[in-house]
Amino acid sequence: MKKIILIGGGGHALSVLEMAEDLSLFEGYADLQENVDMSIPYLGTDEEVMANYPAGEFQIHHTLVYAKDVNLNLRQKMIQKYAAYEKATLIAKTACVTPHSRIGSGTGVFHGVIINRARIGSNCIVNTGAVIEHNVHAGDNVFVGPNATICGGVNIGNNVLIGAGAIIRDDVTICSDVVIGMGSIVTHDITQTGVYVGCPAKFVKSI
């Protein structure tokens, strides 16, 4: 198995290492600077990693998450930057992913997650304690926050952030490039890109 390089060395990268448990899986991490809290080697900037660690010999896992000023395109640009590399899928031992579920390449599934006969795209993050029910189809680069609940039959586009504790009602469709605020409840289809918050969730601003 090819060793994994984490792209990013911030707080989420620390969570990935805790979730994976076996540090021998990792070659190290790339970032603009070293983080002394990381327990794997610092390999340099993106440019240094791509020059010294060939795509054919290593796989990567993206750990960049969204900051307060949510920029959905930033993570997508980083994914494209490393397009030549194989993407490592990481699933915590304590997660429950049923046999008929499908998890895309580069996706991370964290502790206590339940995924029940759902399809999750590539380069997604399903964070601690989230529940994704039957017949959910999530696209690529989707972030599901801690303890969020996505009920059965929901369809989610690409580049979507669902905040911690949010609830998506069954059979709802959410288009691409959408942010659902923490604790919000989505009761109807979302067909316009933007930020939605509240109970029920309502459009508050463009991205």
List each language-model region with its residue ranges.
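Active-site phosphate/pyrophosphate- and oxyanion-stabilizing loops and adjacent acidic/basic residues
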Residues: 18, 76, 184
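Structural signal for interior beta-strand "rungs" in well-ordered beta-sheet cores
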Residues: 89-204
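Phosphate-bearing ligand-interacting subdomains
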Residues: 37-92, 96
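Short glycine-/acidic-enriched loop or helix-start segments at secondary-structure transitions
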Residues: 16-17, 71-74, 190, 206
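A solvent-exposed beta-alpha-beta segment
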Residues: 1-62
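Short, well-ordered secondary-structure micro-motifs
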Residues: 39-41, 100-101, 207
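Residues at the C-termini of beta-strands that transition into short coil/loop
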Residues: 30-33, 46, 64, 91, ...
